[in-house]
Each structure stands twice: as structure tokens, then as C-alpha cells.
């Protein structure tokens, strides 16, 4: 029969303090710091509001990572924490062990108690110093009390906890700084989004992601706020289109009002657009407004004209580009010169190139091979889904011999793998895949390489060949 170990003294003390809220409050300044994380977590989950308020005032770490406890937010518990912060802000002399400088409400995948345990015990201090000093440009030289949040707007209305927090922060401007680095929009009406943005320090926002289908006219209402995010590094847009009802003159004005905001973004580095159609024939307007060198250009399933690609290749801001993703942009009828010129501009820096499902033909591939073979930093190359013959694929593999940093390569199944109706001939694909793999091994030793078919018309999955063939789901 096993004998159960008796509870540690710290555990017994914690249990007693949770049962007796008055005792917990009266002895707070004498508690060992080891008790604070577990006691706070229990008090928060049990909604012991007075205990929470007192614990915040005596918190012995510089950072309180409340976001990890806010999976199911409770307004009264949040109010108690903020009331504790209010007391700290008005105190001339803090309690002896109080060190709190950062209230972190971001939704992170951290266990609250693990943050303070073992080797990571000093982590909250180190992290808070880095965040306040390096990552929040809106605070100036003197660092006030910091409140970190991420905004994820996915409901039609703002939840009561976030509403209370933003209003609380706005009323205490000058005493503390509410910093939001990431803004995600999934479905909130534009008038509600604007209401939120009017309560946020826009200077702090570094990443914006709009994941809902907007008309161009809606994007234009959002644009002035984008221009005020002067430290914006990354913008991600999904499913933005211009209604066919918009007259051409109005469309041009709308595009100008959007693109002109980039003139104010001195630190902008990452442009990511997915299923965006309104810039077709107008990409040059955006490119002319860029103020800094881009590190990433992602334009997947977008409508682009050949002139758009030319203007991209001429843009001075792409010369330090590390990632270029044109997946799903139809290039079948384009001259190869714009893509060749584009690769020429980034040959010294490009690390990731995705030309998947671009409809590239043998002649276009042949034209870009000389410059592709000089992309010495290339580590990831995705080219599957293009209409390439066996001979052209073998030529492509020969041109990758000097690309020593390649670690992931995705290539299309040769055209000869399909019958005249476009159906995959499985045996032929496996045979040609083995030949291509042998050809490559004669040239160099690949790390990860896969030859992929077009998606199956029934299940949507690509069959593949790496070390051996792999079927789709059918």
C-alpha cells in the first residue's frame, strides 16, 4: 500500500489563505514570492476580488501575465486587477516587495505558474524590460506603467472586458500606456472597428491582419487609421475586392486614398495579400508610396497584370527581399521578362520563392533558369502545379546544383505523367519520379524534395513522390 506524501508547508499555507480572504489580505506583504503565482491563479479562478486587488499591489515580479488566465474572461475579476493597478499608480511609496511594471493581457500559450517556476523564474523581469524598452515606440524615453494587449475583433460587438479595459486605459492616459502590437479583424462591422481604433495608441501597432471579405469602399474607411500606425511592419489582407458598380474614376480615387497611407509608414517591411483583386493594373500606385525596403512580398491568388509584375521588378524597395510568394497568380500568358527582372533584383537576398500554381510553361521556365541558379541564399523553392515537361524539369534540377542552402524543394509532376484527358497515370508518374530523383542524386544530395501532381478533382489532395510514391485520398 502506497503512503501519500504530506502536503508541503507552502501548499498548506496556500490552502489556508484561499479559505480565509481576510487573512490573505492582511498578510500579503509578508508572503514569500513563491506563493504568489499559484495563489493568484486560484484567486482569479475563484473570483476572490479583494484578494486579487491586494495581490496586484504587492506583486513581487515586474510582469503579471494575466492573458494566460483570460481564456474565459470575467469582468469583475479584471476590474479587481485594474483597481489594484489604480492604487499603485496613485501611491507615492509602493509596498516593500511590489515590483509590478507590466500587465500583460495578451493571449499566449503559456501556463501561468510555469512562467515563474524553475529556470524561468527571472523570465518575467527580462521579458518586461525588453518589451517596454525595445518594442513599444509610443512611450518615449520615460517608461510608464505598461499594459500589453492584442486586439482580435471577431464578433459584431466588442466584449465587455475589452471595452472596460480600453475605456479604463483612455481615462488614465499619462499615468500608464496601453500597448497593442497586433490587430486582427475577422468580422466586426467597420463602424465598431473605428470605435475601437479611436481608443488605441495607433503608434504601437506593428502588425495588422484583415481576414474578412471587404469591399474596397470599406478598406478606404479603414485606411486613415492605417496611416496613423507609423510603426507598422506587416499588413495582411484577405478577400478585398472592388465592386463592379464603382465607376472607374471613383475606383482610382479609392485606390489612391489607400495607397497614399504607405507614405507615412517608414518601417513597413512585409506586404501580404490573398485573393485581392482591386490592385490589378494599379500596383504601381502602392509601390511608389513605399518608404522602406521590403523583406516579404506575398500576393497569393491575386489578380495581377503583366504591367504590375514589371512595376514590381522596377521597385527600389524590393532589393532586400527575403521572401517572394506569387502562389496562384496566373502567369501563363505573361512574357518571362518581368519575372526574370524581378528575380534579378533579389538574387543576393532571396530565401523563399513560391511560384506554385502559376501556370508557368517550359519556355518561361527556361528564361528564368539562369537568374534562378544565382539565388545563392535560396532555402525554400515551391514550383509545383506548373505545366512542365520531363526535359524541362531535368534542366531545372541541373540549374539548382549551386544552390547549397536549398532545404525544401517542391516540384510539379512532369506533363508526361498525365494522359491526353489530363488524368494522372499513376504508374508513369512513379516511374518518372524515380528517374528525376536519381538525376538529382547524381548532381547533389537533396534534403527534402517532393514531386507533386495537380490536386485530385475528387478529393483536392495532390499525389506526391519523394522517396516513394504517395497517393491522394481517393
UniProtKB/Swiss-Prot annotation:
Keywords: Leucine-rich repeat, Repeat. GO terms for biological process: negative regulation of apoptotic process; negative regulation of cell differentiation; negative regulation of DNA-templated transcription; positive regulation of cell population proliferation; proteasome-mediated ubiquitin-dependent protein catabolic process. LRR repeats lie at residues 97-122, 177-201, 202-228, 229-264, 265-290, 291-322, 323-341, 347-374, 375-399. The keyword Repeat applies. One of its GO terms (cellular component) is Cul2-RING ubiquitin ligase complex. GO terms for molecular function: ubiquitin-like ligase-substrate adaptor activity. Gene3D superfamilies: Ribonuclease Inhibitor (3.80.10.10). The keyword Repeat applies. Belongs to the PRAME family. This is PRAME family member 8. It comes from Homo sapiens.
